[in-house]
Each structure stands twice: as structure tokens, then as C-alpha cells.
From Swiss-Prot:
Residue runs in coiled coils: none
Entry GO CC: mitochondrial inner membrane
Annotated transmembrane regions: 2-22, 68-88, 102-122, 146-166, 171-191, 217-237, 253-273, 294-314
Protein keywords: Electron transport, Membrane, Mitochondrion, Mitochondrion inner membrane, NAD, Respiratory chain, Translocase, Transmembrane, Transmembrane helix, Transport, Ubiquinone
GO molecular function annotations of the record: NADH dehydrogenase (ubiquinone) activity
GO BP annotations, alphabetical order: aerobic respiration
Lineage, opening ranks: Eukaryota, Metazoa, Chordata, Craniata, Vertebrata
InterPro entries found in the cross-reference section: NADH_UbQ_OxRdtase_su1/FPO (IPR001694), NADH_UbQ_OxRdtase_su1_CS (IPR018086)
Identification of the protein by name: NADH-ubiquinone oxidoreductase chain 1
Domain of life of the source: Eukaryota
Source organism of the structure: Tamias sibiricus (Siberian chipmunk)
Membrane topology type: Multi-pass membrane protein
Top EC class of this enzyme: translocase
Function: Core subunit of the mitochondrial membrane respiratory chain NADH dehydrogenase (Complex I) that is believed to belong to the minimal assembly required for catalysis. Complex I functions in the transfer of electrons from NADH to the respiratory chain. The immediate electron acceptor for the enzyme is believed to be ubiquinone.
EC numbers for this chain: 7.1.1.2
Length: 318
């Protein structure tokens, strides 16, 4: 039964991820006043399947100087971790209702750093290594703010369980009292998933393609799938934390509909940002985090900690 539930979670994620690649290409196309893919199938709807078939029937490259075992493990581990992060996410019922669901997601996303590092190092190419080192520095840096923002929001929630966020947000979204944190969280998730304008890891003009420069065919497709799965996951997490849908036990389908709609809107915003903004310089990226986001998130975290203490002497309004 558990295996069946697991498949019912993974297969829709794979389908969503496949069509996200198509939506991105279509959206960028229309924003650049062109059509995007429109040949394979009606309106180009079968394009993701054609891409997948092309990539998986090609012969994978194994560079002579690479460390083969790490070179092959890295992409498969990246996709496995991308799927693992969905386990505690309530939609409205999680696959496994963990007591520390948020910590599990943070820990798993931290492990994803290793896949990038391994792929860059095992490729034995200077471009791949530079791309991997950039990606690792960027991901580790932005995880600091993600963790502090989560702590601040969870002080309002009173629990590390993701399901309790639904109960907390029955009357109002947490986005309203914590909107500065939500804005910083959204920008940090952009950096965490290596999306434009923070896609420094694959700066074409300087690093060719970043940490996956030596990958082709199947292993490259696995990295690609992991990236897009992470994008949907991060937006689903943002929806759960800041824009919790109302759960009516008599009609749980409405929760899923609302949850999906908000996740789609956030994902469309990710793609819109990619179409609109140029890439940051690396020093600007680090300056934004360590000089701007970190002091602000720490100050707001202190405010959230001290607020209940300040308000403790005020009698409740009955």
C-alpha cells in the first residue's frame, strides 16, 4: 500500500515537471514575441516527451579522466533527493506525517549541495569545478536565511509540523503579518534553486554550462529533472508556509485545488522573473545575502521572539 502511495506521489510530480519545461519555453517564447515549441503534437503539447525520448536514447558520455562512480551517482542522487523533499508536504495529507517535517526538508535540501559538488569534482573539468564551487557557496549561503525565516514564521505556528500550518492559517495567511520575511523567502528560494537572476552556476559566457558541462543524454536529463522538481517543491512549500489553503474536512478536494493554483501562480512568477531580469554579478549576489538579508532576518527573528514576551502582560480581549 505504501509503495502505491509513493507511486501516486512521484508520477504526478514527474508529469508536472515535464510540462513545466514546456510552460517555461512557451512563456519565454511569448514574452520574446515568438511562438515557442509548437510542432510536436497539438500546440507542442508532446514536446516534453519528445525531449525525454531524445535524451534517454542518446549514448551517455563518460569522460576518460572523470571519477566514474561519483560521476554517475551525482545525478541519480540529485533526483532522489528532489523527490524525497515531497514526503512531508501536506496536500492536504502528507505521505509521511513527520513531527519535524520542516527540518527534514531543510536537511534534505542541504544534502543536494553534495550532488552539485560531486558532479563538478568528478567531471575533472575546470569549468565544471568552478560552477560547482559557485553553486555550493550560493546554496549554503542562502540556506542560512531560509532557516532563520523558517524559525521566525514557525514561532507564530508553534510547531515544526507542516500540517499544523494549515490550522494556523485558517483565518488569515501568514503572508500578511510576515510579508517582509515572505519577500526575502521568495528571493532566497530563487537563489536556492539556481534560477535566474541567480543562475551564476551556469554563466554561459564564462563557464559554458556550469557544473553539468561534461554531462550528456540521461545523466544530464536527471539533473534537469531535479532542478525543475525542486522549483515546484519550493513553490509548494512557500504556499504551505505563507499562503495556507483552508481545509474543509467535508471537501478536501478544494484544499488541493487551492494549493495547486497558488503553487502554479508562484511557479509562473519564477518564469516571469527569468524572462525579465538580467543575471546578478557574483559579488552582488553575496552582498545581497550577507549585508542585506541576514541582518534583516535576524532583526525580524528577534522581534518575533520578543513579541510574545512583550504582550504577555496585556490581558486577553474576551
Amino acid at each position: 500500500m505504501f509503495l502505491m502511495n509513493l507511486l501516486l506521489l512521484i508520477i504526478p510530480i514527474l508529469v508536472a515537471m515535464a510540462f513545466l519545461t514546456l510552460v517555461e519555453r512557451k512563456m519565454l517564447g511569448y514574452m520574446q514575441l515568438r511562438k515557442g515549441p509548437n510542432i510536436v503534437g497539438p500546440y507542442g503539447l508532446l514536446q516534453p516527451f519528445a525531449d525525454a525520448m531524445k535524451l534517454f536514447i542518446k549514448e551517455p558520455l563518460k569522460p576518460l579522466t572523470s571519477s566514474i562512480s561519483l560521476f554517475i551517482i551525482a545525478p541519480s542522487l540529485a533526483l532522489t533527493l528532489a523527490f524525497t523533499m515531497w514526503i512531508p508536504l501536506p496536500m492536504p495529507q502528507p505521505l509521511i506525517n513527520m513531527n519535524m517535517g520542516i527540518l527534514f526538508i531543510l536537511a534534505t535540501s542541504s544534502l543536494a549541495v553534495y550532488t552539485i559538488l560531486w558532479s563538478g569534482w568528478a567531471s575533472n573539468s575546470k569549468y565544471a569545478l568552478f560552477g560547482a564551487l559557485r553553486a555550493v557557496a550560493q546554496t549554503i549561503s542562502y540556506e542560512v536565511t531560509l532557516a532563520i525565516i523558517l524559525l521566525s514564521v514557525l514561532l507564530l505556528n508553534g510547531s515544526f509540523t507542516l500540517s499544523s500550518l494549515i490550522t494556523t492559517q485558517q483565518f488569515t495567511w501568514l503572508l500578511l503579518p510576515t510579508w517582509p520575511l515572505a519577500m526575502m523567502w521568495f528571493i532566497s528560494t530563487l537563489a536556492e534553486t539556481n534560477r535566474a537572476p541567480f543562475d551564476l552556476t551556469e554563466g554561459e559566457s564564462e563557464l559554458v554550462s556550469g557544473f553539468n558541462v561534461e554531462y550528456a543524454a540521461g545523466p544530464f536529463a536527471l539533473f534537469f529533472m531535479a532542478e525543475y522538481t525542486n522549483i515546484i517543491m519550493m513553490n509548494a512549500l512557500t504556499t504551505t508556509i505563507f499562503m495556507g489553503a483552508l481545509l474543509n474536512p467535508l471537501n478536501p478536494e478544494m484544499f488541493t485545488f487551492s494549493f495547486t493554483l497558488k503553487t502554479l501562480m508562484l511557479t509562473a512568477t519564477f518564469l516571469w522573473i527569468r524572462a525579465s531580469y538580467p543575471r546578478f554579478r557574483y559579488d552582488q549576489l553575496m552582498h545581497l545575502l550577507w549585508k542585506n538579508f541576514l541582518p534583516l532576518t535576524l532583526a525580524l527573528c528577534m522581534w518575533h521572539i520578543s513579541l510574545p514576551v512583550i504582550m504577555a502582560c496585556i490581558p486577553p480581549l474576551t
